[in-house]
Amino acid sequence: MDTLWKERFGGIDRLYGSGALARLRACHVTVVGIGGVGSWAVEALARSGVGRLTLIDADDLCVSNTNRQLPALDGQFGRAKIEAMAERCRAINPHIHLNLHPQFVTPGNLDALLGTPVDLVLDACDSFRSKVEMIAWCRRRKQPIIAVGSAGGRSDVTQIRVRDLSRTEHDAMLSLIRKKLRGEFNFPKNHDRYFGVPAVYSLENVRYPQADGSVCGVRPQLGKDEALKLDCGAGLGAATHVTGAFAFAAVGKAMELLLKPKQP
């Protein structure tokens, strides 16, 4: 292992044991969704010495990303998120290998975007249907994947947990994903069985913005075509200390999986 690599990332071996850094250097992780959670996850993976990253997202940076997304800075607004994060990754590690896909994951492009086997997929996108299809696609192919639930509307990082997707609580989106996977993709209906998909979520109740400007735990009444979600201009509020904590919890689990001894 070259001297530069050891100087930059030697602390990883001193934490996980000799040889861990060499294994991470050989790993390939795909991050889907480079937003409030995904951008911080990419940062943590790059700083942990992961040698190859694939970044998938079609979004550009906007001013209202500033409260939660790592690359949202003056001079970067309007730039593709994957390009901004790629530049940052190369500054962290000039030898990192990057694959950039300026696309959103859809049921129709999973084979094209995820067809190359990787060591792990980290799902940080916020599209319900894409998450369902991606999890099902990965499980059919025995491709390890970590799913990230909703960080919006939450403020207490001590409530964040990592459990199998079949066991998550207090996350409406993950609950609906679980129902869809059982109903349409033949995931175990027996509640004693696990899905084999680690998920990051929070036990904290969601804080909803109200029409009068207050915030409380009561979901506001919406029109039939409206949906309350985390977005650039309205919907659920969010803060960096929570989106970042979700990301770091996901990367903590990723490190565990990537460094798990290989089965003979």
Task: Name each region found by the language model.
Residues 2, 116-120, 125, 130-133, ...:
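Glycine-rich phosphate/adenylate-binding loop
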Residues 31-33, 56:
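Conserved N-terminal Rossmann-fold NAD(P)-binding element of oxidoreductases
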